[in-house]
């Protein structure tokens, strides 16, 4: 991954964390690495544990940020969330996977939250 892509991703994750806090989320952990993959943000929304994938784009020629989530990435997100829940003994909590789309193609960043993005809780 190029330096510029890493910096774009890091900026997107920082913007997303602040955005989520403003939406009432409590940020528990960022950049959580597990054998199954990385979880960008682990947060709590009310009683629900949220595993948040952040997608950031500077240019939209190839689609919106949320459209870049592949089936393989979805499978990794599910496996990572399950692993996190087991590791921290949180299986009793309701959970979901959310996406935050960060569009940096305009002078002002545009963020969008998609709760329960995979349609399962």
UniProtKB/Swiss-Prot annotation:
In terms of Gene3D superfamilies, this protein maps to:
3.40.1350.10
Pfam families linked to this entry: UPF0102 (PF02021)
Q: List the protein's name.
A: UPF0102 protein DET0781
Known InterPro entries for this protein?
Answer: Restrct_endonuc-II-like, tRNA_endonuc-like_dom_sf, UPF0102_YraN-like
Q: Which Gene Ontology molecular function entries are recorded, alphabetically?
A: nucleic acid binding
UniProt lists the family membership as follows: Belongs to the UPF0102 family.
Q: What is the source species?
A: Dehalococcoides mccartyi (strain ATCC BAA-2266 / KCTC 15142 / 195)
Q: Please, which domain of life does this record's source organism belong to?
A: Bacteria
What NCBIfam families does this protein's entry cite? PRK12497.1-3 (NF009150), PRK14688.1 (NF011280), YraN family protein (TIGR00252)
């Amino acid at each position: 991954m190029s330096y510029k892509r890493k910096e774009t991703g890091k900026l997107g994750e920082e913007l997303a964390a602040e955005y989520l806090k403003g939406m009432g989320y409590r940020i528990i952990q960022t950049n959580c690495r597990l054998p199954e993959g990385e979880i960008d943000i682990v947060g709590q929304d009310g009683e629900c544990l949220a595993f948040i994938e952040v997608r950031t784009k500077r240019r939209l020629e190839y689609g919106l940020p949320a459209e870049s989530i592949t089936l393989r990435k979805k499978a990794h997100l599910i496996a990572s969330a399950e692993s996190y829940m087991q590791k921290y003994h949180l299986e009793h909590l309701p959970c979901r996977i959310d996406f935050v789309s960060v569009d940096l193609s305009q002078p002002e960043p545009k963020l969008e939250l998609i709760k329960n993005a995979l349609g399962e809780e």
